[in-house]
């Protein structure tokens, strides 16, 4: 299965996004568009990035009643995105409805993945704030099995849980993993993190990397380093 690095373009405007991507010239990295940018610029930012040749992960984390999730995904399916997501906590029925809404009349659709637990969450937070008295591994894999049962393509989890997900759901079930930082970088507000090489060795199919690339002195060099470490599993010292 092909692996890739997805750049989290967590900018507040189209201008900032285009200025950043212009640094890559003819390279067309896979990009993630999140709530901040999508809510600021609307669907046109997605259309323009597709015209520019980028693959897009639209990260809106839909979590609503099944009917609303279905109708929302029906709208998103018209944007020619490559991947989008829902919250696994929305239940199996919601995920099934979202998948149905995302599927176009010709049977094609973007990849649909489910968010398990955000990488800013740890077990203490789950217990105190969410009243979930289980280990992170148990919670994430339970959500992953629900997503598989609903027919989804994979889950968002930390790279620390990727191997557990593959053990239960198979190698073809995708693990899309934020919480990736360089060994010499700052972890920021992330609590469950690995390096690109560690993520690859633990089974991540896609890694989502934001600030270590977007805030780097040389974003292109940082991106290439990330790709090299992820695809070569750390064999290159860059």
Describe each region flagged by the PLM.
Residues 79-91, 189-222:
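Glycine-rich phosphate-binding active-site loops on the catalytic face of alpha/beta enzymes
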Residues 3-9, 31-33, 56-60, 84-86, ...:
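Hydrophobic faces of well-ordered beta-strands that scaffold small-molecule active sites
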Residues 26, 52, 79, 150, ...:
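Structural motif
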Residues 14-16, 36-52, 64-71, 88-111, ...:
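Active-site-adjacent beta->alpha loops and helix N-cap segments on the catalytic face
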Residues 12-24, 67-75, 136-146, 191-198:
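Short, acidic/polar
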Residues 2, 68-72, 77-153, 158-161, ...:
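Conserved anion-binding
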Residues 1-20, 163-170, 187, 194, ...:
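N-terminal amphipathic alpha-helix/helix-capping segment at the start of soluble metabolic enzymes
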């Amino acid at each position: 299965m092909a692996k890739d690095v997805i750049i989290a373009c967590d900018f507040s405007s189209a201008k900032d996004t285009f200025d950043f991507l212009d640094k890559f010239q003819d390279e067309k990295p896979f990009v993630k568009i999140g709530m901040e940018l999508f809510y600021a610029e609307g669907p046109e930012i997605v259309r323009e990035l597709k015209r520019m040749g980028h693959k897009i992960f639209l990260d809106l984390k839909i979590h609503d009643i099944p009917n609303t999730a279905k109708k929302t995904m029906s709208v998103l399916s018209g944007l020619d995105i490559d991947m989008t997501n829902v919250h696994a906590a929305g239940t199996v029925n919601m995920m099934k409805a979202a998948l149905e809404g995302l599927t176009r009349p010709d049977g094609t659709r973007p990849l649909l993945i489910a968010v398990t637990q955000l990488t800013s969450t740890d077990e203490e937070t789950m217990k105190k704030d969410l009243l979930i008295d289980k280990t992170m591994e148990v919670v994430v894999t339970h959500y992953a099995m629900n997503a598989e049962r609903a027919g989804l393509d994979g889950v968002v989890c930390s790279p620390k849980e990727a191997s557990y997900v593959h053990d239960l759901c198979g190698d073809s079930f995708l693990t899309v993993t934020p919480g990736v930082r360089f060994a010499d970088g700052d972890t920021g507000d992330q609590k469950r993190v690995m390096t690109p090489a560690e993520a690859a060795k633990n089974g991540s199919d896609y890694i989502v990397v934001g600030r270590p690339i977007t805030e780097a002195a040389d974003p292109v060099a940082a991106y290439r380093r990330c790709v090299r470490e992820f695809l070569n599993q750390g064999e290159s010292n860059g």
